[in-house]
Amino acid sequence: MQPPPPGPLGDCLRDWEDLQQDFQNIQETHRLYRLKLEELTKLQNNCTSSITRQKKRLQELALALKKCKPSLPAEAEGAAQELENQMKERQGLFFDMEAYLPKKNGLYLSLVLGNVNVTLLSKQAKFAYKDEYEKFKLYLTIILILISFTCRFLLNSRVTDAAFNFLLVWYYCTLTIRESILINNGSRIKGWWVFHHYVSTFLSGVMLTWPDGLMYQKFRNQFLSFSMYQSFVQFLQYYYQSGCLYRLRALGERHTMDLTVEGFQSWMWRGLTFLLPFLFFGHFWQLFNALTLFNLAQDPQCKEWQVLMCGFPFLLLFLGNFFTTLRVVHHKFHSQRHGSKKD
């Protein structure tokens, strides 16, 4: 090989030789990466199929145990109960395992994203995504408080109201997508607290299309005041729930992927019961909104279909939020009373 010519060209050629050597190392590293990736895919497929087989056999075993339990002698009941407990524990272990394996997206994610794999493969990535979701909720809640306050007390314009409602539609749509991804990654979000975001998306979309007029102006201030109060309560919930979750995770009593929610769950009983009056007041305000809209719909001057279409979601939100919260409170009172009787 000829020596490089002197001067700037020689320096460039020497740099190119160094780059060539580095590139060969990169090629080898990339080749190993692709091999490991293929091995990982095979392991994922094997693990998924093994878990599927185990779950199917567990279901068959649970059915057989259920059939034979009535005819068991008294001395065998303890062993049957122990077996049931172990099977439930196994189901929980499978849930944790599947959080690290690729899975098919649900209907909603398939419609929005297609068949893209949204499973994050490391604890750090899962926790970082969950943390980013929590921060997103916090920042948007603060923004919603400020905008609803501005629309309620400073500006009376259908344009700014429409911008506020558009922000609500975008916020709730984004929440539903992010929550679906978090569920795919092991977050245990209860059914209603996910579904009520779909209802809120529909409600905000209808509010966005409601034209300015007499009926809209009659309901406008009430809706903006409610939105301001709701965002304030959501801010309180995030602030106190995040601290409570941090303590419970440190004690090993909560899962690392558990989230703050816009409601009340059993783990909040210790230290967060002071939020209940705020929540119940908000629930009954939703009922008041529904009744107001149903009353407006009976007005002879009411021509807009949006009046009734907003009333029904508010009623559904009240029923879902109120009875879900009430069920949690009733369950905790019942379990505490049962525990005190045992003592």
Swiss-Prot record:
Quote the subcellular location field of this record: Cell membrane; Nucleus inner membrane; Endoplasmic reticulum
Entry membrane topology: Multi-pass membrane protein
- Positions that bind CoA: 130, 187-188, 237, 240-241, 283, 332
Pfam families in UniProt: TMEM120A-B
- Using the record, list the residue span of the signal peptide; answer none if the entry has no such feature: none
Q: Name one GO biological process term.
A: fat cell differentiation
**Outcome, altering residue 193 to A:** Decreases the binding affinity with CoA
Q: Which InterPro entries match?
A: TMEM120A/B
What keyword terms does UniProt attach to this protein?
Cell membrane, Endoplasmic reticulum, Immunity, Innate immunity, Membrane, Nucleus, Transmembrane, Transmembrane helix
Q: In which tissues is it expressed?
A: Expressed in nociceptors.
Cellular component per GO?
endoplasmic reticulum; membrane; nuclear inner membrane; plasma membrane
Q: Which residues lie on this side of the membrane: Cytoplasmic?
A: 1-132, 178-190, 241-270, 331-343
Chief location of this protein within or outside the cell: membrane
GO MF, one term, reads:
coenzyme A binding
Q: Which residues cross the membrane?
A: 133-152, 159-177, 191-209, 219-240, 271-294, 305-330
Q: Identify the residue ranges that face the Extracellular compartment according to the record.
A: 153-158, 210-218, 295-304
> How does it associate, per the subunit comment?
Homodimer. Forms heterooligomer with TMEM120B. Interacts with PKD2; TMEM120A inhibits PKD2 channel activity through the physical association of PKD2 with TMEM120A. Interacts (via C-terminal domain) with STING1; regulates the trafficking of STING1 from the ER to the ER-Golgi intermediate compartment to elicit antiviral effects.
Q: What is known of its domains?
A: The transmembrane domain (TMD) has structural homology to the very long chain fatty acid elongase 7, ELOVL7, despite low sequence homology between them.
Q: What does this protein do?
A: Multifunctional protein involved in mechanosensation, and plays an essential role in lipid metabolism and adipocyte differentiation. May function as a potential ion channel involved in sensing mechanical stimuli. Mediates the mechanosensitivity of the PKD2-TMEM120A channel complex through direct physical interaction. TMEM120A seems to affect mechanosensation by inhibiting PIEZO2 channels, possibly by altering cellular lipid content.
- What further fact does the record state? TACAN means movement in Farsi.
Concerning its family, UniProt says: Belongs to the TMEM120 family.
Name it.
Answer: Transmembrane protein 120A
